[in-house]
Amino acid sequence: MASLVDVVGHVNDPGIDVLEVLESMDIVSEFPEKVLEEAERVPDAPTESDLEGRLDLRDEITFTIDGVDAKDLDDAVHIKRLKNGNFELGVHIADVSYYVKEGSELDKEALNRATSVYVTDRVVPMLPERLSNGICSLNPNVDRLTQSAIMEIDAKGRVVKHTITQTVIKTTFRMTYSDVNDIIAGNQEKAEQFKKIVPSIDNMVQLHKILESMRFKRGALNFDTNEAKIMVNKEGRPVDIVLRQRGIAERMIESFMLVANETVAEHFAKLNLPFIYRIHEEPKAEKVQKFIDYASSFGIRIYGTALSLIHISEPTRPYS
């Protein structure tokens, strides 16, 4: 016999359809009371003792770049040119593990949720907002604890030196992708507003182009697709669908996160330590064969296997 478990809301409540979907997937917005109580015991700011043993980067010009709607600012960057002409790039990630201890109620809840869930009009966070939007968010002009990959990169895009360490930073600005894209496009008003970091943005553009060029030479593919965003009104009803345009700012951050991820992965691989890697597995033979058959219909002959593809383009007609 069926019984009432919970009342989600009235059918006409704003956003009730989204809440229904979340409930049907066992994605719970509310946190258990014991998790919230533990979150309340987390301080609002680091203490002096928290900073001990950490590399102090608060004097570096460091800033975040995110979407305009972002609230949990979990990564930041700094960049400068060294005397030898190389770039120093720092990628800083909020040190959540300093506050969320293994086996704690916060840790168990985060393990159960696995990730933050982004839907049309809201975010269901992995951690309570006191942490995700507070001390674990790299908000401007406040001290924040971070894990950092600091890399020296030469003019060919090679990481010649790196340091991976615990740090303390203080971001200068909370930048949006549109702000940075405007500055790159020559918007003088934005350049004046954020003049302190304009030299950093110039360096970012230069380094991004170097890193992107190196990736393409290594055989990387550019899947630069536009993402749709559903616009809703105050009642939570969809009113429009717009395309998120990816500018150079978005691609720069992507380049910097990629080089940081590669550097960290290589670092721990050389140490032969247990580590979690995200890799692209070799394609299945039947999928490769389907692709070869499909490509041949366009006059392109492909030689190789799933282990090593060597392709020679021989189109029967010119392509642009």
Model-derived features with residue positions:
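OB-fold/S1-family single-stranded nucleic acid-binding modules
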Residues: 1-13
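Electropositive polyanion-binding surfaces
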Residues: 14, 18-27, 34-309, 313
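A short, hydrophobic C-terminal helix/tail in secreted or cell-surface proteins
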Residues: 312-320
